[in-house]
Amino acid sequence: MTVFEAYITNLGKYAEGQLVGETLKFPATTEEVQSLLKNIGVDGVRYEEFFITAFDGDVMGLYDYLTEYENLDELNHLAHLISELDSDEIETLEAALNKGDHTSSVADIINLVHNLDCYSLHPGVTDDETLGRIYVEDMELLDVPDNVLPYFDFEAYGRDMRINEGGHFAPTGYLTRSGDFKEVYHLSLIHISEPTRPY
């Protein structure tokens, strides 16, 4: 299963005015990476460096945080982790990415994937009024008498709750933090198991 793709370009040839590159699908095997590098002329002798000119895939918001000089091993590790997520976890990841939580590097995003259980996502909740109604009518967090309910300002209540709990409206729903974030991964190949380290 392809999680995302990256267009890998030979940096030396690019500096010479030639655009030589190919698409690599992640997760990738060592053989796929080595074959791609050979095909684009990155041989470790004349041409040693490459860069990524484009990313593509279905995880909304992920590519906003990936740069042209990302580590292929880390990208592959991230792709393996994402491939193991179910659809609800993908939606939570997309909401956290939309919020900008832990997105300063691929290592941060790897840690974000490891900590998705620290978040609660309420799918389809995209405005303060809906949030206020859910908290008052469904979850009964506030006891509002029936005769006052038609006049109650659900939008103001929802806004206050969102501000107080540090919530965020994302395209996939309303996101809150519900646990302590633990840094599991550090930029080190020690943390990347052999099957996910292609380069």
Predicted regions and their residues:
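Long, highly charged low-complexity segments enriched in Glu/Asp and Lys/Arg with interspersed Ser/Thr
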Residues: I163-L189
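Structured domain cores in non-transmembrane regions
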Residues: V33-D101
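Extracellular/secreted glycoprotein ectodomains characterized by long, lumenal stretches
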Residues: E70, S83-E91, A95, T103-S105, ...
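Single conserved hydrophobic/aromatic residue that forms the stacking wall/gate
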Residues: I190-Y199
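N-terminal ordered "arm"
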Residues: M1-R46
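Amphipathic protein-protein interaction modules
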Residues: N111-H168
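Short, glycine-biased loop/turn motifs at secondary-structure junctions and
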Residues: T9, A15-G21, I40, M139, ...
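Short, flexible loop/turn elements at secondary-structure junctions
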Residues: N10-K13, A28, D56, A156, ...
